[in-house]
From Swiss-Prot:
It comes from the Bacteria. HAMAP family: UPF0246 (MF_00652). This is UPF0246 protein A1S_2267. Belongs to the UPF0246 family. InterPro entries: YaaA.
């Protein structure tokens, strides 16, 4: 089983790291090409492209300028500890055991606009480049065209390395669009999380994002390898809804408190 999650806009480069083990990202030659494109943008152009404030745009212009592929702990940290958002609140990587991190390194991947596909212990310098950004580049008009099948091919390599034929999609639609489903050499399962509000069950963004992280943690801590095993997920009040699920989409509900 290989699980995919999205990255986060919010980053944490301050909290003390629980391990000094690390790996280097595997698609850095591609990242360097994107950095070259981004370095040509002014702060104002970044602000317009990313729909962010001048302050955030200036910060990221500086990050693009300072980026260099010689990553160490003076300028980078492991991806699983660097991202800080709703998904990562659910994942709570800082409290995973060593054996869990070892399992995650083989079975969890983070999609990234800049780095393509990250393993948990891959070092990364801070950045902001969302997958949906319409950044014109040497390969096309956006990041989906830039990455083309590169991410998909890497996923297939990672599936083969762990002898798995199951991909669990816990990523957002924006990021999952970077994966070419037709070329994935595995069964694909997507967990969906619905919360009850005013007597109706629906996807509530904040809760759904956190639930994806909780599911990733559930997979890691229990070292799951079969789609059937996912149905036992019952963290924080969620339960499997067999009636509304299919082989490709597993629905989990949580009743209003």
């Amino acid at each position: 089983m290989l699980a995919l999650i999205s990255p986060a806009k919010t980053l944490d480069y301050e909290t003390a790291l629980p391990t000094d083990e690390f790996t280097q990202p595997r698609l850095l030659e591609n990242s360097a090409q994107l950095i070259d494109v981004c370095r040509k943008l002014s702060a104002s152009e970044i602000a317009n492209l990313m729909s962010v404030s001048e302050k955030i745009a200036t910060l990221n212009a500086d990050r693009f300028r300072d980026w260099k592929p010689e990553f160490d702990f003076s300028n980078a940290r492991q991806a699983i500890y660097a991202f800080k958002g709703d998904v990562y609140t659910g994942l709570d990587a800082y409290h995973l055991k060593d054996k869990d991190i070892d399992f995650a390194q083989q079975h969890l991947r983070m999609l990234s606009g800049l780095y393509g596909l990250l393993r948990p212990l891959d070092l990364m310098m801070p950045y902001r480049l969302e997958m949906g950004t319409k950044l014109k580049n040497t390969r096309g008009h956006n990041l989906y065209e830039f990455w083309d099948d590169i991410i998909t091919n890497q996923i297939n390599e990672d599936l083969a390395a762990i002898k798995s034929e199951l991909l669990v999609n816990l990523a957002s639609d924006e990021y999952y669009k970077s994966v070419n489903e037709k070329k994935i050499k595995a069964e694909i399962v997507k967990p969906v999380f619905l919360d009850q509000k005013n007597s109706k069950y629906k996807v509530i963004s904040f809760y759904a994002k956190k639930a994806r992280g909780l599911m990733a943690r559930f997979i890691i801590e229990n070292q799951l390898n079969k789609a059937e095993d996912l149905k036992a997920f019952n963290t924080e009040g969620y339960y499997f809804d067999a009636d509304n699920s299919s082989a490709k989409e597993l629905v989990f509900k949580r009743d209003e408190q």
